Every structure is written in C-alpha cells, then in structure tokens.
C-alpha cells in the first residue's frame, strides 16, 4: 500500500483488504455499524459490535476511528493501483493498543513493565570473576552474588555463566548449588535458567515423584501464550527427554487432564482482534445451557469454549453470559465445578480479564497468612521480572492497599529477602 513505509510502526499492525463494488456506499455502511454483503474479506465476513464511530471524510481517504475488543481501526485507504470502474479495494490499517489490560495475550509490554533491565555497561568477565571470588575458599559472600545476579538480565546471566566456565573451568549453576542452600539457593538457581527452560523445570518438578502440584501446571499453562507454550514444550523435551503433553496425560486424569491438554495445545487464537457478536452470544447461550440451565454440568462445553476462543472473544462472551444468567461466569463455574477443574477454569477467566491482577493475586496469597508459598513467590517474581512485574506491582497496590515490597519485607528474611527486593525494585 502506497505511503505505508513512511508510517511509524510503533504498534502491532495488520492490513485487511476488503473488496467492494460501490465505493460511494461504504462509509454509510460503516457508520451504520452493519456489515455489508459488499464488504468481504477473502476468508470471511467482518462483523462489528456496537461501538462508537467517528467518520472524517477526506479527499484521499476516509478516517474511521473506533475501538472494539482491543483493536483500533485508524484509517481506510482506497488503493488507486487496483481501482477500476467496477471494483475498489479498501484497505484497513488495524493498529492494536500497546497496553491492553484485558486481552492479555496480545499485550505488547512496554519497557516500564520490566523491573530487571540489566546492566547498561555490561562485561561478563569481571562479573564472573566477582562470583568466583565470592565462592572461593571458606565461606560465601552472598551479598556479592546478589549484587551481580539480581541486577543483570537473563541474557547477561547466560554470558556470565559462559565466561565463568571459560575462566575457571567450572559450571556456574553447579558451583552456586554447592555454596548456597534453602530458599536463597532456589531463587538464585531460578535466575540462572533461561526463561523457557526454567518454566519447563517448574512443570517437570510439579509432576515428578509422588503427587502432582496441579496449581503450578494450571498457572503456567493458563497464563502463557501459544508461542510461549511451544517454546516451553521444546525446552521440556530437550532437557528431560520426554513429551510434556504425554507426561501431563500420565499424571492427571478426567476433565482436569482434558483442560490442561487443551491449554497446552494452544488452540486459542492469540492474534485475533475480531469479535463476532453472533458467535459470542451463541457461546454464552451454550455455556448457560451446559450449566445453570440443566441439572448437572456439561464440562466439555465449558472446556471447549474457554480453551479455544481468543481473549477478546471471551470478554464479549462473559458480558453476554451475565445478561443471560444474571450472574458472572466466575460464580457459575464455582457452583458447577469443584477442585482442580474449578481452579483451572477460574484461572483462564482471571487471565482473560486481567493478567496483571491474576499474578498480583498469586503473589498476595503466596505470602498471606501463616507460612509462605516460596515456590509461587519465586516463580512469579523471576518469570515476570523481565516482562511486566512493574505493572503487576501497580495492580498489587491497587488491589490490596500495600506494596509488594512491603509484604516481602514482612514475610521473608536474610539474603532471600534482599535478593527478592532487588528483583522487585522500588514500588513506593
């Protein structure tokens, strides 16, 4: 499309081309919010929900600004190269918002969400030497380890590990394991794994031995994108010589197994910004018919819709469902299911509504009351520190009236506390 190279590409964009016979009628069609049979894509019709419209005619193009389910259509350009007496191509440039709070899996996280940004003047060799000296001889300088590893990005830590091996002939992770212990060791080792390998390790540990930590599996599978899950599966097979899906099937059963496998297969359309209001209404009616309307529950209907629809679509489904059932989808799930299946379904809903709120809740309840769920605390701080931890911290304060740092200070101690606080950073 002409002139497109000059446009700044700050957000994720998609070009959608429509074919129309009469170029004079299409603005009115858009203004009336009704899809026209004349406006078609090669693969499907485009349906638009009720929304706000603003039309500004121009000699060269018509600008239409409206928001629907996270996508912003900013302009419609007539393509003069393909125009003819019978047909005009109309191209829509669709720009997705940078900070989408609800449709979590299309959010492009800004730098302000990252709490660990690494060293701007990074050199792995002196860092490796500092770590070697901190662990050489009798005793360990834990603070030196904290100062280096919590203030470097994961990519920088991998370079430090390579330099450590090259300079001293030792594996850094194994050396750290031999010098550290307890929760502090667990946190530092978590920092040393590449992100997908770390999450693969968490899944492996959740299933090995007697018993299964279903909550860990649910958290990871429900909150990651399709591409992230594919990378985790790849890392899992490389590190443990086993297929993640097969291991989940072997370690779980019933409807919990089905929803976990469905989530792992990544059937959700992460990229779709379109909502078909008719399909959303039908899904809401199907969910109502599968639960509140009948005696018993059609669990597979819930699983199919929750695990295969995009987040933007599900948000519309939840709205329609509440109108039909006079109660939220969360309340219906609580009344229709129980145990780990209930937890899995509710997690999908929470992640769909607001991913940052979900992680804030996980961190809060990891520290609330007697004892600390250190695995949950470590996993979520480490895995989100280079993605959106600052945004999670903001949501944490809104939800609970206290900062994440203050709760960590109250609930942890020693080197473990200091390392966590370094990763979290200031959230006053």
Residue ranges and their predicted role:
Residues 90-428:
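Structural signature for extended repeat/solenoid scaffolds and their inter-repeat hinge/linker regions
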């Amino acid at each position: 499309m002409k002139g497109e190279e000059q446009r700044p590409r700050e957000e994720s964009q998609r070009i959608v081309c429509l074919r129309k016979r009469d170029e004079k009628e299409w603005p009115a069609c858009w203004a009336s919010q009704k899809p026209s049979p004349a406006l078609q894509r090669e693969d499907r019709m485009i349906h638009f929900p009720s929304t706000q419209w603003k039309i500004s005619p121009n000699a060269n193009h018509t600008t239409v600004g409206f928001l629907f389910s996270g996508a912003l259509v900013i302009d419609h350009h007539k393509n003069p190269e393909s125009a003819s007496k019978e047909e005009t191509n109309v191209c829509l440039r669709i720009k997705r918002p940078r900070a989408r709070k609800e449709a979590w899996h299309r959010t492009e996280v800004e730098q302000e969400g990252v709490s660990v940004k690494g060293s701007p003047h990074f050199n792995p060799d002196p860092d490796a030497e500092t770590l070697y000296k901190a662990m050489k001889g009798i005793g360990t300088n834990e603070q030196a380890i904290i100062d280096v590893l919590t203030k470097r990005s994961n990519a920088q830590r991998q370079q430090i590990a390579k330099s450590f091996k090259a300079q001293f002939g030792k594996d850094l992770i194994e050396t750290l394991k031999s010098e550290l212990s307890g929760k502090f060791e667990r946190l530092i080792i978590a920092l040393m794994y590449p992100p997908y390998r770390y999450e693969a390790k968490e899944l492996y540990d959740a299933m090995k031995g007697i018993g299964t930590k279903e909550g860990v599996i649910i958290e990871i599978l429900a909150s990651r994108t399709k591409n992230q899950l594919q990378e985790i599966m790849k890392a899992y097979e490389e590190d443990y010589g086993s297929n993640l899906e097969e291991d989940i099937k072997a370690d779980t059963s019933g409807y919990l197994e089905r929803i976990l496998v469905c989530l792992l297969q990544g059937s959700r359309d992460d990229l779709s910004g379109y909502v078909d209001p008719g399909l959303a209404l039908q899904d809401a009616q199907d969910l109502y018919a599968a639960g509140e309307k009948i005696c018993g529950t059609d669990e597979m209907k819930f699983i199919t819709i929750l695990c295969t629809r995009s987040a933007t679509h599900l948000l519309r489904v939840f709205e329609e469902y509440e109108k039909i059932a006079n109660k939220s989808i969360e309340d219906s799930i609580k009344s229709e299911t129980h145990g780990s299946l209930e937890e899995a379904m509710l997690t999908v809903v929470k992640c769909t509504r607001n991913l940052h709120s979900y992680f804030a809740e996980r961190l809060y309840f990891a520290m609330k009351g007697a004892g600390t769920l250190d695995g949950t605390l470590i996993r979520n701080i480490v895995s989100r520190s280079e993605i959106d931890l600052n945004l999670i911290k903001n949501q944490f304060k809104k939800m609970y009236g206290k900062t994440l740092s203050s709760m960590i200070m109250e609930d942890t101690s020693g080197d473990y506390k200091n390392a966590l606080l370094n990763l979290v950073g200031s959230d006053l």
